[in-house]
Amino acid sequence: MPIIEPIPMDELSPVSRAVIESGCEEGLYATPIPLQLFAYSTRHLLAMDDTRRLRGSGLLLGGRILELLRIRSAQLGECQPCMQSRKHDSITDEDVACLLDMDGGNLTEQERLSVRFMDLLSADHHAIDRAFYAELAEVFTAAQIIELGLSCAGSMGMHRFIHTLEVFGTDEPVVKYSADQVDTAVEPVGVA
């Protein structure tokens, strides 16, 4: 069981339940469990779902690069469901293997630099210096570089957060489900 007990499907609000069921049916999500956790904050569940639905649709980097980044982020964050799922038809097992060994494979220069950016942002963000940005600028526009950075930051943060929740943990939850925990807040001390 995750650290925070997922909201049971039959206890979800109609909006949250529709988001989770349609997302899983459409193949956007490999498992409903993280979404059942995010449903504690309906606003954030909806925002996350909107972001996921936009990914690769009309964005400047394209679906293949964004999918490679999502998988690499999952590898770095040790998110098993996301490592195993493929959300873009062009991604092969060979492509995924290339994410672990950047010297081999058939990745394009844009793909290789995108994955390298993700790796550096994860492990040594100080190495993303002027020279690296100049290298990026040889194959990307400024708008694509911004999209790359924001996509990597969002994906990496999400996978690390999901990892901390122990989505597939076997221990009892630290925070048990209670309906009064959904879309509510404890007033900060000293605030009237």
What is the role of each PLM region?
Residues 1-63, 88, 180-192:
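Mobile cap/lid helix-loop segments that border enzyme active or cofactor-binding sites
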Residues 25, 43-48, 78, 113, ...:
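Short acidic alpha-helix initiation/capping motifs at coil-to-helix transition points
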Residues 56-61, 104-107, 134-139:
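Short amphipathic alpha-helical boundary/capping segments
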Residues 62-69, 143-148:
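Alpha-helical scaffolds flanking conserved acidic
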Residues 66-89, 152-155:
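Short, thiol/selenol-centered motifs that function as redox-active sites or metal-ligating centers
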Residues 95-109:
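Acidic/His metal-coordination segments adjacent to aromatic residues that form catalytic metal sites
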Residues 109-150:
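Acidic/histidine-rich alpha-helical segments that form the ligand environment
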Residues 142-188:
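Preference for long, well-ordered alpha-helical segments
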